[in-house]
Regions:
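FAD-site-proximal beta/loop scaffold in flavoenzymes
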Residues: 155-171, 259-337
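Conserved phosphate-binding and hydrolysis motifs of nucleotide-dependent enzymes
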Residues: 9-14, 143, 179-184, 270, ...
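N-terminal Rossmann-like FAD-binding beta1-loop-alpha1 element of flavoenzymes
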Residues: 3-30, 184-193
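Glycine-rich flavin
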Residues: 2-3, 19-26, 31-171, 199, ...
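Short glycine/serine/threonine-rich phosphate/pyrophosphate-binding segments
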Residues: 12-17, 39, 159, 184-187, ...
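Hydrophobic/aromatic ligand-binding patch that stacks against planar heteroaromatic rings
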Residues: 16, 20-21, 40, 138, ...
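Short hydrophobic core segments
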Residues: 6-8, 113, 133-143, 178, ...
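Rossmann-like dinucleotide/phosphate-binding beta-alpha-beta segment
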Residues: 177, 182-203
Length: 338
């Protein structure tokens, strides 16, 4: 099947790029192996903000209810309902993406994509069937996945990434969150609001270390007020799951070691690019030492006709940044091609 443009990845970068390409008169296809809307809409920014809204209401009722005029004898906080609501919010928006694809005449192919030539993509569906798509231009928007050191085993029950944490309906009694970026701090806030004993472990000297120091200072005050424990300047040496119990986490600071015990551990130390097994290197696309796709200011890779946007490039890993990059990529190849 021949197209003007093929977009690999249907997250906020990919689907926006596909829409813009179609609006510019290009015959467009989009491929995703799992979800329309990508991580953001399905298991990332959207459901997490839904949970944060529930958490904000729960925290307000518990801590300031009487002050604000709410009286109750038996307040019941059902976290499973909060999670179900977050799934409903997510699913509604994902359906909206499907509508936008149809409205703009974009062909959707669900399956695993692999570049087999600089103008050809093979798509393998879940049932094993394979199709071959060709295009003048290909936009790579494959995103990123949770980074987990090989020695840490994520079992989805005691040791989690955001992927398992965002959908679990049962609250742990206690949790150690490894990493204090946006994901770690968001889950700390949500779980703490529902009464979970939360400890954040951060290797660097302050929480949200990629933000300005003023942001870290204010957020530290806010989390301390909520009685969320923070251990900065501590490195996680080992995570051990305990049979019929939870986890033991060995942390160190200088020459001192100590063990934290909790029902669960959440690994939130960053992301790795989804660039492996994509065929990018096979067709000559330059990948840096960390696995990110190298691009110029127009989102072009070193291979003419192949573009890359969003998290897989290692730029600012934010949904709206990916969307803006998608529009730039569309403008770039449209200006170059008749």
């Amino acid at each position: 099947m021949d197209y003007d443009v093929i977009v690999i990845g249907a997250g906020p970068g990919g689907y926006v790029a596909a829409i813009r390409a179609a609006q510019l008169g290009k015959k467009t296809a989009i491929i995703d192996k799992q979800w329309m809307g990508g991580v953001c809409l399905n298991v990332g920014c959207i459901p997490s903000k839904s949970l944060l809204k529930n958490a904000d209401v729960a925290h307000t009722l518990l801590k300031r209810g009487k002050e604000l005029g709410f009286s109750f004898d038996n307040l019941n906080l059902d976290f499973s309902v909060a999670v179900k609501r977050s799934r409903q919010v997510s699913n509604r928006l994902v359906k909206g993406i499907g509508f936008l694809m149809k409205k703009n005449g974009i062909d959707v192919h669900m399956g695993v994509a692999k570049l087999v030539a600089k103008d050809t993509v093979e798509v393998t569906a879940e049932d094993g069937t394979m199709i071959s798509l060709q295009a003048k231009d290909i936009i790579v928007a494959t995103g990123a996945s949770a980074m987990v050191p090989p020695v840490w085993e994520v079992d989805g029950e005691k040791v989690l990434t955001y992927l398992e944490a965002i959908t679990q309906e049962k609250l742990p009694e206690s949790v150690v969150i490894i990493g204090s970026g946006a994901i770690g701090v968001e889950f700390a806030t949500v779980w703490n609001s529902y009464g979970v004993d939360v400890t954040i472990v951060e290797m660097l000297p302050r929480i949200v270390p990629m933000e300005d120091e003023e942001v870290s200072a204010e957020l530290t005050k806010a989390l301390k007020k909520r009685k969320i424990k923070m251990l900065t300047g501590h490195k996680v040496e080992a995570i051990e799951t305990v049979e019929d119990a939870g986890v033991k986490i060995t942390i160190s600071a200088g020459d001192e070691e100590k063990i934290l015990e909790a029902e669960q551990a959440l690994v939130a130390i960053g992301f790795r690019p989804n660039s492996q097994k994509t065929g990018l290197e096979d067709v000559g696309v330059q990948i840096d030492e960390r696995g990110f796709v190298s691009i110029d200011e127009k989102m072009a890779t070193n291979v003419p006709g192949i573009w890359a946007i969003g998290d897989v490039t290692g730029k600012l890993m934010l949904a709206h940044v990916g969307s803006a990059m998608g529009i730039l990529a569309a403008i770039g190849y449209t200006a170059r091609r008749p």
